């Protein structure tokens, strides 16, 4: 399983998994590979005009082999609805997860970056992460993360 590190030097890190899940929360000077914080996940709620609302955890389905020696456990809320699939692409310092689900009336992708030092944020590699707050167009909503 992939765990793309998000975080700068001395800032700790959170891993972005291939399904779009947040994992390996290594913050507050605590190494924690393989661990996920309880109920720490983005979600999506969307409603097309004239259609029922749809809500999902914003990550692809959990597929075997399941994580952990005791299966899914309760930390990652396995009973909540997730998306059908995801495609992960990444080349340090940037990663992108494109989500796929026929039930969603929108296309969803998560883009994340990991600066090694603060001045990297002004480099061309980070131009696509330039929103200080949410950025939106008719086809795209961008939320800065992290």
Each model region followed by its residue ranges:
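Mature extracytoplasmic enzyme cores
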Residues: 1-146
